[in-house]
């Protein structure tokens, strides 16, 4: 079943590809719109390419990325037809499962990169998450293994396998393959051409209500889709449904304190609450924190819905406690949104949503704090503190330590939050100095 691989295809293959593409486009007519793709490179830059008709244009960067030596493959997870968030949840689960399968077994021989497919417009629902796989040794069984993996998908919207190949004239082609019985069948082809970088990251239209939720109902709808395969989702929903939809803050101050790893946030929140005789709350709250590990292992849309609903549970507690005492909140909506944006938007700092984008705006139905403080430390102090830490870390905390670009994206995203914005506090000095500074900020904001 395996086919013989060659570094470059013969001349007749390029001619055949052109004829196949012409027939396909004639049959599809105006329905066949070019698909665009973006790939994150090791230096955190993004490269874009589009599928279209053959031209004489050759792009050295694309040839190096997708052409020989070795062989490259791509797959994107499509959305199934349907209304609501069900298709997005299903696609996210397929993508998550494929990632786990690609990281084990014989397909570990392939190098993985993030791939995003998107349409020519900027409408939500066009983005398709996927993978670019690079087989440096061009193993003869890689295509077969990938087709069998995709063939095991039971979902209606099944991913297709694309393979990249250069012809004798140096043009790059993408060919779609299917496994029909025990035969590998090519079902489509198109020429791979460079594309201009869009003005905004192509994922931005899909960020809202897929990673950053604008209201309680949007997050709730996602977990509702999960109750059949995550029993704990029903328990979370039951707790949320016990909370009134509209809550109001009491007469006392509500202060949210945010901070990256090694900023001393946990210690500071305790000290501030003791100094002010305030109630200390955490997000997610203890009533659902027992299920964090379960949801941390789920795809982004499910994980973020869980943390978003945790904020609404905390809001109910804030409303109750702030009638009698000041309230200090250890993390709130800003951290939920910040990590979602920094994780989902591929590439470096320049690809983040621009300032004043809707993803930086506080949800209209979530109780708002009076003041949000963001603790920061300089790099030297951060390294010193991290060396003394041994507690278990979340995936995102581990990423913060290992990936400086991700850390910069998190910091920049925090600083772009609005309504309310974050007040930066340098937490590098001694604990006593930082505590005094924070208490002064709280006092001045309450005047």
From Swiss-Prot:
It is found in: Mitochondrion. Residues 380-412 form a coiled coil. Keywords: ATP-binding, Coiled coil, Kinase, Mitochondrion, Nucleotide-binding, Pyrimidine biosynthesis, Transferase, Transit peptide. It catalyses: CMP + ATP = CDP + ADP; dCMP + ATP = dCDP + ADP; a 2'-deoxyribonucleoside 5'-diphosphate + ATP = a 2'-deoxyribonucleoside 5'-triphosphate + ADP; a ribonucleoside 5'-diphosphate + ATP = a ribonucleoside 5'-triphosphate + ADP. The keyword RNA-binding does not apply. Its EC number is 2.7.4.14, 2.7.4.6. ATP binds at residues 259-266. Disruption phenotype: Deletion mutant mice display calcification deposits in the brain. Neurons show reduced mitochondrial DNA copy number and impaired phosphorus and energy homeostasis, suggesting that dysregulation of mitochondrial function may promote the initiation and progressive development of brain calcification. One of its GO terms (cellular component) is nucleoplasm. Residues 1-73 form a transit peptide. Pfam families: Thymidylate_kin (PF02223). GO terms for biological process: cellular response to lipopolysaccharide; dTDP biosynthetic process; dUDP biosynthetic process. Induction: By lipopolysaccharides in macrophages and in primary microglia. GO terms for molecular function: (d)CMP kinase activity; ATP binding; CMP kinase activity; dCMP kinase activity; dTMP kinase activity; nucleoside diphosphate kinase activity; UMP kinase activity. It is an enzyme of class 2 (transferase). Belongs to the thymidylate kinase family. Mitochondrial nucleotide monophosphate kinase needed for salvage dNTP synthesis that mediates immunomodulatory and antiviral activities through IFN-dependent and IFN-independent pathways. Restricts the replication of multiple viruses including flaviviruses or coronaviruses. Together with viperin/RSAD2 and ddhCTP, suppresses the replication of several coronaviruses through inhibition of the viral RNA-dependent RNA polymerase activities. Concerning flaviviruses, restricts RNA translation when localized to the mitochondria independently of its kinase activity. This is UMP-CMP kinase 2, mitochondrial. It comes from Mus musculus (Mouse).
């Amino acid at each position: 079943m395996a086919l013989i691989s060659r570094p470059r295809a013969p001349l007749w293959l390029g001619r055949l590809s052109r004829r196949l593409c012409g027939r396909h486009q004639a049959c599809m007519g105006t329905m066949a719109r070019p698909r665009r793709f973006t790939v994150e490179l090791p230096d955190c830059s993004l490269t874009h390419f589009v599928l279209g008709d053959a031209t004489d244009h050759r792009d050295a960067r694309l040839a190096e990325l997708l052409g020989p030596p070795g062989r490259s493959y791509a797959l994107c997870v499509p959305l199934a037809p349907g209304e609501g968030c069900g298709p997005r949840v299903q696609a996210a689960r397929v993508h998550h499962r494929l990632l786990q399968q690609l990281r084990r077994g014989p397909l570990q021989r392939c190098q993985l990169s993030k791939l995003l497919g998107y349409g020519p417009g900027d409408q939500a629902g066009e983005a398709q998450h996927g993978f670019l796989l690079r087989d440096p040794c061009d193993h003869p069984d890689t295509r077969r293994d990938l087709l069998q993996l995709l063939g095991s998908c039971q979902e209606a919207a099944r991913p297709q396998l694309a393979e990249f190949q250069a012809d004798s004239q140096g043009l790059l082609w993408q060919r779609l393959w299917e496994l029909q019985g025990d035969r590998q069948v090519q079902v489509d082809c198109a020429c791979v051409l460079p594309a201009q970088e869009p003005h905004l990251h192509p994922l931005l239209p899909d960020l809202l209500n897929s990673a950053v939720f604008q209201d309680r109902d949007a997050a709730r709808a996602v977990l509702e889709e999960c109750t059949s395969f995550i029993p704990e989702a029903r328990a979370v929903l039951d707790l949320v449904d016990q909370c009134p939809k509209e809550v109001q803050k009491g007469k006392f101050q509500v202060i949210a304190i945010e901070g990256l790893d090694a900023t001393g946030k946990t210690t500071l929140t305790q000290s501030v609450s003791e100094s002010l005789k305030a109630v200390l709350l955490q997000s997610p709250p203890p009533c659902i924190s027992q299920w964090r590990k379960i949801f941390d292992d789920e795809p982004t849309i499910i994980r973020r819905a869980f943390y978003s609903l945790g904020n609404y549970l905390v809001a109910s507690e804030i409303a109750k406690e702030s009638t009698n005492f000041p309230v200090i909140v250890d993390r709130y909506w800003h951290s939920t949104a910040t990590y979602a944006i920094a994780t989902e938007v591929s590439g470096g700092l320049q690809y983040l949503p621009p300032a004043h984008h809707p993803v930086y705006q506080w949800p209209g139905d979530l109780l708002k704090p009076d003041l949000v403080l963001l603790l920061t430390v300089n790099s030297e102090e951060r390294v010193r503190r991290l060396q003394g830490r041994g507690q278990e870390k979340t995936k995102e905390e581990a990423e913060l330590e290992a990936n400086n670009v991700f850390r910069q994206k998190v910091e920049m995203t925090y600083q772009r939050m609005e309504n309310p914005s974050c007040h930066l506090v340098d937490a590098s000095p001694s604990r006593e100095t930082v505590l005094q500074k924070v208490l002064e900020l709280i006092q001045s904001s309450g005047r």
